[in-house]
Amino acid sequence: MSASYLPSILVPLVGLVFPAVTMASLFLYIEQDEIV
């Protein structure tokens, strides 16, 4: 199995996408809370 390229994809994915999703969900939660 050629899974040696997996970390080079997962590390940036987890390092960039996860914080972005967290920031986006937090931003939407704050915006929704301010509207209501």
Curated annotation (Swiss-Prot):
Q: Which GO terms describe its biological process?
A: photosynthesis
InterPro entries, A to Z: PSI_PsaI (IPR001302), PSI_PsaI_sf (IPR036357)
- Its predominant location is plastid
Q: GO cellular component annotations, sorted alphabetically?
A: chloroplast thylakoid membrane; photosystem I
Localization of this protein:
Plastid, Chloroplast thylakoid membrane
Question: Which keywords does UniProt give here?
Answer: Chloroplast, Membrane, Photosynthesis, Photosystem I, Plastid, Thylakoid, Transmembrane, Transmembrane helix
Which Pfam families does this entry report, sorted A to Z? PSI_8
Q: How does it sit in the membrane?
A: Single-pass membrane protein
Sequence intervals crossing the membrane: 9-29
Main function: May help in the organization of the PsaL subunit.
Family, per the entry? Belongs to the PsaI family.
User: What's the name of the protein?
Assistant: Photosystem I reaction center subunit VIII
